[in-house]
Amino acid sequence: MNYDVIIIGAGPGGIFSAYELTHRAPALRVAVFESGHPLSRRRCPIDGDKIKTCIGCPTCSIMSGFGGAGAFSDGKYNITNDFGGTLYEYIGKKQALELMRYVDEINLAHGGEGTNLYSTAGTRFKTVCIQNDLHLLDASVRHLGTDINYKVLQNIYEELKDKVTFFFDTPVTAVAAADDGYRVFTAAGEYTC
């Protein structure tokens, strides 16, 4: 099967790449290959009672699947260049912050509305830190919480599922350059873009 774009991985980078492509170039045929499960099928067997530790599932539902490793996190999104990544080194601090705010807007539009945005800037706590020679990094943090984070991811998936072809439980085994694009190999077959 041939696609215009193939994305490997349905973590945040893959999800937002697919989101942008469907909004900016809706005619493109986009496929996303993910080694893990759809969000609705991601379940870890650890229950704290019968199963207390990792049993080494062939596909880890905590680390893999739609939403990536952060799907079941507490949904904190940092909007800062001071920590958490180095995107600003490639595109500049202003544009990096603009992109972080853009992602925040998408999250809000997909179920995150009503959540709080916290900031360390201008707080009494920051003043106390400075008085004690401690240096608190400035950041705005959107705290969605685990349940709302899941809801946001599910809503984004619902928006994308009819515009993007998702291949879940389909690890990519190899990628090779071709004369007119790339060949992507899985156990189920070969795909091109």
Residue ranges and their predicted role:
Residues A71-F72, F167, F185:
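A general beta-strand register signal
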Residues A27-E34, L39:
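Short beta-strand "acidic-cap" motif of Rossmann-like dinucleotide-binding folds
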Residues M1-G13, A31-F33:
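Beta1/beta-strand and adjacent pyrophosphate-binding region of the FAD-binding site
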Residues M1-Y3, A187-C193:
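Core beta-strand elements of the Rossmann-like FAD/NAD(P) dinucleotide-binding domain
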